[in-house]
Amino acid sequence: MVRQARETGPREEPHSPGVTWHESGLRRSRRWSRLRTRGATVWLTGLPSSGKSTVASALEAMLVEDGIPAYFLDGDNLRHGLSGDLAFSTADRTENIRRVAHVARLMADSGMVAIASLVSPAHHDRALARELHEAARLQFLEVYVDTPLEVCEARDPKGLYARARAGKLLDFTGVSAPYEAPEQPDVLVHGATEEPLVSARKIRVALEDAWVS
């Protein structure tokens, strides 16, 4: 699921003027070996209220209980800080994904499993997140939480679908903004019919398979 590439991070990307990439004196393989860990990013995508966060939380707990360092990057929480200056325009969504993808890549490089849960509705944005990891030779699993729109609307714990239908919330994915479903996700889970723990176990198996491939 990753192309053969260098261990270190990308250096071809846009960066601040006069700044060069600083190579660590500690190779990733050495860090992982000494810490007895392996890094990766699990990226959950799906409609709002599809069950992404519930599955992500279950996966995080499962991995940590098994002694695997993992951290859940919740899309809503990240907009309280890292992306607190962004709204929901197409450009802002793209920038949000870019920021989170870079954070996840750094976490994966350190030997953690970053579990990112974001609507991330556009193919090209998710492709960017994957490419960042593949360029750094890090595992990236795209998980599509496939839940019918009507089920998501029926859940609507924050009342966002109702507000969007009433025209009070613009650029809302699934109502006034499109969602581009993954065509070939690494893992497909069914948010309306699967228990979160079942979905989490499915992702865990795929992650183990990716590490040994």
Where are these regions (language model features)?
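Conserved beta-strand scaffold positions in the cores of enzyme catalytic domains, especially
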Residues: 72, 140-142, 186-188
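Extreme N-terminal, non-catalytic leader segments
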Residues: 1-41
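ATP-dependent NMP and nucleoside kinases share a basic, alpha-helical "lid"
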Residues: 81-88, 92, 104-165, 171
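The conserved Walker
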Residues: 48
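Small-molecule kinase domains that catalyze NTP-dependent phosphoryl transfer to phosphate-bearing small molecules
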Residues: 146-149, 154-213
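Hydrophobic anchor at the beta1->P-loop junction of P-loop NTPases
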Residues: 44
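Conserved substrate/cofactor phosphate-moiety recognition/catalytic segment
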Residues: 57-105, 109
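Conserved lysine of the Walker
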Residues: 52
